[in-house]
Amino acid sequence: MKNKTEVKNGGEKKNSKKVSKEESAKEKNEKMKIVKNLIDKGKKSGSLTYKEIMDELQEVDLGPEQIEKIYEVLESVGVDVVGDMHEIEVEEEDLDLTIPEGIAIDDPVRMYLKEIGKVPLLSPEEEIDLAQRIKNGDRSARKKLAEANLRLVVSIAKRYVGRGMLFLDLIQEGNLGLIKAVEKFDFKKGFKFSTYATWWIRQAITRAIADQARTIRIPVHMVETINKLIRVSRQLLQELGREPQPEEIAKIMDMPVDKVREIMKIAQEPVSLETPIGEEEDSHLGDFIPDDEAPAPADAAAFRMLKEQLLKILNTLTPREEKVLRLRFGLDDGRARTLEEVGKEFNVTRERIRQIEAKALRKLRHPSRSKKLKDYLD
């Protein structure tokens, strides 16, 4: 028969699964709503630009594969997805490889930025030619298309500096997204490669930040929820002129107050015990946090002195009496033995051990011995 603890734990697990399913259903409904809005908007104008789609999808956590499916759904209902060429050309012209402020950077990274700056940008015709060759299995074309867009990765990675990952790591993660974009690019859809690759690069970087930037990993969907909560908090701060209450945030986000409090708790960054303290930073936070499990120095010293006095008093008994008391009260290993167990140790009856114990305790109660221990009992 299950005990109460098992029943309680089972109930908690069921509740946890129920909450998880509710969150999943809510996220799914939110995604479906956004897709429906895109379809309605696209049918009115006949087409959608990449930027319009990305602006709508920015609020939800979608993988690149899911984005591909949304493109297919839009095209299946007669909505053309087109590239905003003017916008992308401006973006490419604005790409810069300068190092962000406050970023310590060594010579190898400087050399990398210098090298990728030498690679010329591709024209739309060159991109189409390379894409066709990639489709036919040309590995050199794949390499050339990726190298020509490395500066795009650096430009995007700069926007995510200060979120818990090194600049070089952000570039590396963005490069992985770029490689994926090279493999998936379909020039027949009409937009430039940089338009298409931007999403993959951003997605790779944001997922890496979610997975690696925190000491305790938080799932990607929760990172998105935390970001949304932060945006709502900032908006309310500007409107109210003070820090918003959880109840006010919950109303805007359309979720229970307890859930908002839970998200706020999850969003807190852990603080290292090695955090430097003071102007000279010669102390650490851990130096000022007491160990609740460790005894106070005064108590530890008193216990040690009591132990020394107890050993001296036990030495005044006969060897047999001393050993019986040590076993009966577990003075050596913390495990008290029964009369039966001690009797087997000495090969005598329980009654005999009881008599030896009683005699030894009478001796310890004598004022000549007991007065030495009384001070430790106050």
UniProtKB/Swiss-Prot annotation:
Q: What does the organism's lineage look like at the top?
A: Bacteria, Bacillati, Bacillota, Clostridia, Eubacteriales
What is the residue range of the motif Interaction with polymerase core subunit RpoC?
169-172
Q: Which residues form the signal peptide?
A: none
Q: Which PANTHER family match?
A: RNA POLYMERASE SIGMA FACTOR RPO, RNA POLYMERASE SIGMA FACTOR RPOD
User: What's the family?
Assistant: Belongs to the sigma-70 factor family. RpoD/SigA subfamily.
- What species is given as this protein's source? Clostridium acetobutylicum (strain ATCC 824 / DSM 792 / JCM 1419 / IAM 19013 / LMG 5710 / NBRC 13948 / NRRL B-527 / VKM B-1787 / 2291 / W)
What is the protein's name according to its record? RNA polymerase sigma factor SigA
KW Magnesium (keyword) present: no
Q: Which residues bind DNA?
A: 339-358
Positions of region (Disordered): 1-29
Region called Sigma-70 factor domain-4, residue ranges: 313-366
Q: Subunit details for this protein?
A: Interacts transiently with the RNA polymerase catalytic core.
Q: Region Sigma-70 factor domain-2: which residues?
A: 145-215
Check the record and name the Gene3D superfamilies matching this protein.
Answer: RNA Polymerase Primary Sigma Factor, Sigma-70 factor, region 1.1, Winged helix-like DNA-binding domain superfamily/Winged helix DNA-binding domain
The subcellular localization recorded is:
Cytoplasm
Where do the record's region annotations for Sigma-70 factor domain-3 lie?
Answer: 224-300
A GO molecular-function annotation: DNA binding
Pfam families associated with the record: Sigma70_r1_1, Sigma70_r1_2, Sigma70_r2, Sigma70_r3, Sigma70_r4
